[in-house]
Amino acid sequence: MFTKPIIFVSFITIPIVSLFSAPKYILFGWEFGQTKLHELIEKAPYFDTLPIDGIGITPLTGQKDAIGRPMWSRYLMHTGPWQHEDVKPLVEDFRRLTSHKSMKECFFGKFFSSPTNRIAWTDDAVWARIGQNMRVLARLAKEGGVRGFGIDHEDYFRQEQFRHRRSDGDYAKTASLVRKRARQLFSGVFAEHPTAVIITFWLLSQEEIYFGEVDPVVTMRDRGDLWPAFINGIFDVMPPTAKFVDGDEKSYRYRADRGDFERAYVQQRTKAIRLVAPENRQKYMTLASMAFSVYLDMYLANEGDEWYQPPLNGSQLERLRDNLRGASFASDEYVWFWGQAHCWAKWPEKRRFNGHFKQEDFKRTWEECMNGLIDTIAQVKDPQAYGFKLWEESKKRGALKVMNRNSACLDDARKKKALPSPYAYWQDTYRRDTNGVFRIDSTFGEGDTSSICVEGVSHGSVILPIKGVQSGDWYAVEFSAFGEGVSGDVGWYKNSKWYKASGKVAVVFEDGVAKDSWRKARGVFRVPTGADGFGLIMGVHLMPGEKCHLDNVFVYKLEKEGVEK
């Protein structure tokens, strides 16, 4: 689960899009621009086994326009005009594709992209044709269950579509016209697909040059930048049911251990908004979602390469894990992956490939190149779901390893303190008026006649310490409680002292069980980097005269099948 604090900018509250849900992971890459629609449908069951929610698709459909030119988003800027009847036969195929759980968050890639030849902003006919094509694909997306559209306006063909030229005329008038064109294009899109999500590899996150300026509008004019005007035009016509996602492509280079993702999130919210017209700022705050990216090729690169992420604890996969964790924590809803040299799936025929890579590269999957990648992504995406699934699988194959002594909370005549080994206890007598009692009750227990009894402790805990663990190992804990005022969590040790560099993990009680009966609390977790032990903390918060009982305390080490040590 990923949460973040609510930030206040002036008087506007930033909405948290997915406060209590796992992030949505979207795959983009060269392989998906070379794939036929029927191939995607055939591979969808395989993608269902991956911890993903969708892909950016520009599949080859085989559809042609009236004069035989390919009809798909990558050709949208320079073909058409298209008609809905031209793509209507594809609706059922897209419904089949998006019926899969791994395809619920698919995006039409290259929906609006940089043109191969610069288009005059004054050319009404061309912009009308492009708008018609976009509207046709928007309707197809809505009817086919596709979540939305990808915008990639990077200037691959060096046409400077969003850079003002003197031949355009006055900058202010041109910027106004650009904003009008965006309204013209996207009013039709939202009319056909009012709940569309527009994901951009960058919305305003790349405009850092303006963030420190006293008057960014003046700087935009001096630089001839027309992109913010286009974005404002989209916001002009965006309904409250739609969403804009800033993918922050420069986050390829971010490092979680430097706090880069959190810094970028705050910067996007507090600085980028100055590039948004005042009348659209409320829309920006409520409809714009912040996302971050993972560039897979960087984790296979060699030191000295332009695109490179250094290893963490000797492993580039661990660096990917840490950065993915940072991206997932800081994003509002989406994290997207970009890959070039390899593929997620084995495809049935040779793919076209960029000259930077060998054809052989495309025969290897990312998992083959980074063993454990898919499992790592699953762990980061939803640690609780992953851990509980691993726990259940271990139970089924009888592989649970109990790591603690005295789970039954039996008395020990040799004990020198109120509770027997290995249990410790604590109450805050320094800052609170508490003077309760910890003891073994040999007359009452869950399934037997022994348990730990706590009486009158207003703020304290019973602690089960576990030492000698390794970072990256998975554990499960459970205990039973009778009575009110009991909570559970796990904290970390380093060199036998509390280690607070990583946050605690909650151990949660099952719902729907009366507090005048035994209740079970459970938790799962991965040991964080730097920790060499942990403590299961069974917290107690009792009123005078109240008591509670604790029993059946278990700590299990969890390991995937085939890797038990």
Which sequence ranges carry the predicted segments?
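Single-residue recognition of alpha-helix boundary sites
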Residues: P15, R179, G562-V563
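Extracellular and organelle-lumenal recognition/adhesion modules and their flexible linkers in secreted
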Residues: E392-K565
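Bacterial N-terminal signal peptides
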Residues: I7-I16
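Positively charged n-region of N-terminal signal peptides that target proteins for export
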Residues: M1-P5
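Short, solvent-exposed coil/turn linker segments
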Residues: P15-I16, K36, P70-M71, Q83, ...
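Glycan-processing catalytic domains of CAZymes
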Residues: A22-R397
